[in-house]
Design a protein with these regions (language model features):
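Non-catalytic substrate-recognition and accessory regions of acyl/acetyltransferase enzymes
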Residues: 1-48, 65-74, 81, 98-101
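Generic detector of low-complexity/intrinsically disordered segments
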Residues: 61, 96-97
Length: 101
């Protein structure tokens, strides 16, 4: 079940995290950068949002935001990796050369 909601992603470079506010709840993905790779390390989403079906729309918005730039994505967080694996055709160009998930 996909929720149809517009999700705005903000890059908080000082805290090294992508942020979004959904239904007045803060969602965070912590990251680190090396060369031209973004390592998505930790996802913090309130259970009420996960239970409400907001995880996939949030990850779609996040990966779309990253896709606009020139970085590749290394999903070290299991939930993000699972989502990318499920949608591998859509996001295969975001993975570094030679990396499979």
């Amino acid at each position: 079940m996909m929720i149809d909601v517009e999700i705005k992603i903000t890059d908080n470079e000082f805290l090294r995290q992508f942020e979004s506010v959904i239904n007045e709840e803060l969602v965070i993905v912590e990251y680190s950068q090396q060369e031209r790779k973004v390592f998505l390390t930790k996802l913090k989403m309130p259970e009420v949002l996960k239970d409400g079906g907001y995880l996939e729309p949030f990850l779609e918005a996040l990966l779309g935001y990253i896709q606009e730039g020139t970085h590749k994505v290394v999903p070290t967080n299991p939930e993000i990796a699972k989502y990318m694996r499920k949608n591998r055709r859509k996001y295969k160009d975001l993975l570094p050369v030679g990396m499979n998930i």
